[in-house]
Amino acid sequence: MKIVRIETIPLRIPFRTPFTMAAPHEKSRNSIDCLVVRIHTDEGISGIGETQAWRRQGSLEVLLNLQRTIREIYEPLLLGQSPLDINHLLSLLDAAAYKSLYAQAAVGDALYDLAARFHGVPVYRLLGGKCRDNVEVGMCVSIENDMQAMIDRAQKAYDAGYRHIRIKIGIDPEDDVKVAKAIREHFGDRVSLRADANAGLDYPNALRLLKKLEPYDFD
């Protein structure tokens, strides 16, 4: 089985409401750009991966750059190769475009998806087997000017079954403490609280804020 084509599908996914955080490059968004990658083989089996083009800490990726990296650098290296030699292929990509992690993630996911389809097993079987029957997930609450709106978002997530609430922080530490207090008082010990400043705080300010958040029992 050989790789014969790599397909890239750009998407722009709109948010239902604006999403605000403290990331230095982009504090508020109305949508997110994603790239779906499908790897095709000569046996008709294909695998799908996905990545984001999000200008935030650790990444300045845009869709065009992701597509060009995959089409112009990755695809020539992958064509004719066995998609089952995953570690070898990823090492080739890393050497050709060092630290292009977002593009590489989509290709890597597609290779694992393809291999799992070929062997007729879930991907976790290729990664050493199942560790647990389910995985708990959380919901992220955007920074809002209206505190009640943040509580309402968290309540909506709770009603949908989420028990881990992650609040965005880092723009105004005083507001962060007020929100943490309000959400903890609203839910009591029914949820676990987490916080994410998206690189919006330096080390000294982060320590000061964390100290103030201690009474609200963050994970």
Region annotations inferred by a language model:
Residues M1-R194, N198-L207, K211-Y216:
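N-terminal capping/lid subdomain adjacent to the active-site entrance of alpha/beta enzymes
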Residues D219:
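Cleft-lining beta-strand/loop regions that shape enzyme active-site pockets
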